[in-house]
């Protein structure tokens, strides 16, 4: 996802969307694996399914990498929010004493 698009969406919403895409990708991968193992296929059909399987595995891997990055970004944002809250609390406590 491009940086500009990432700025327009909340990180949590992006994570939710990406998790859904990853889930769908895994379901599709299971379906392809099932078709590969359950039927007697022609060599051409088998190659096609193997290609689709590799494509889905690459897509799932990319989604997992992106999720890892987004979760790290989300963690940094949360820590920054907590730090700002603590700082404001300390300033308020100092000011009111």
UniProtKB/Swiss-Prot annotation:
Keywords: Coiled coil, Membrane, Transmembrane, Transmembrane helix. It is a single-pass membrane protein. InterPro entries: CCDC-167 (IPR028194). One of its GO terms (cellular component) is membrane. The chain crosses the membrane at residues 78-95. Its main location: membrane. It comes from the Eukaryota. It is found in: Membrane. Residues 10-79 form a coiled coil. This is Coiled-coil domain-containing protein 167. The lineage of its organism: Eukaryota, Metazoa, Chordata, Craniata, Vertebrata. The gene is CCDC167.
């Amino acid at each position: 996802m491009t940086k500009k698009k990432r700025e327009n969406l909340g990180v949590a919403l992006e994570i939710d969307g990406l998790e859904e895409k990853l889930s769908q990708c895994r379901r599709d991968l299971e379906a392809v694996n099932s078709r590969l193992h359950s039927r007697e296929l022609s060599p051409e059909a088998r190659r096609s399914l193997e290609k689709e399987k590799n494509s889905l595995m690459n897509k799932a891997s990319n989604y997992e990498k992106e999720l890892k990055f987004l979760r790290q970004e989300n963690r940094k944002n949360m820590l920054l929010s907590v730090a700002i809250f603590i700082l404001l609390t300390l300033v308020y406590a100092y000011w009111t004493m």
